[in-house]
Amino acid sequence: MKLTTLIPAITTALFLSTSITYAGEIQKMNQTEKDVYSTIENMTDAFHKGDIKGVMGSYEAQATVVFEPNKPASDMDQIRQMFEGAFQMNPAFTYSGHDVIVTGDIALHIAPWQMKGKAPNGTEIVQSGLSVAVLRQQPDSSWHMVIDNPHGQILMENK
């Protein structure tokens, strides 16, 4: 697997992976929005622990993840491999906010992010973007990601 493929994979894997949240944002969320946000935090915790089962459990079986701009992946084996490759770089993500919008059983999570990590050769990697994720409430009331795109900023960059 190429480094150029792994870098976006890391980005995707962690676009939601932060414990850094503005306290006011969470306080302003209603319980349903907090439940959606909790899904994001749980995925992040699993990612930081290298827990592929926990990461994959954050997604519906038919999910699509955009590891590279304009290249969505819907094959769960490929998605698993990309996340496992991303674990190796120990990236650190920071976010400048979280926005959660819910209507019925569908939720949208938006978060600007910055990532710092190291390539296998020790080269520092720094990236930033806008994460956009769509989640669906499950019959057991939990929330799982259906679409995960950490490259939402691409549309603005390519004007």
PLM segments and residue spans:
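N-terminal hydrophobic alpha-helix used for membrane targeting or insertion
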Residues: I7-P8, T94
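A beta-strand edge to alpha-helix "cap/lid" segment located at domain peripheries
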Residues: Y22-G57, T64-K159
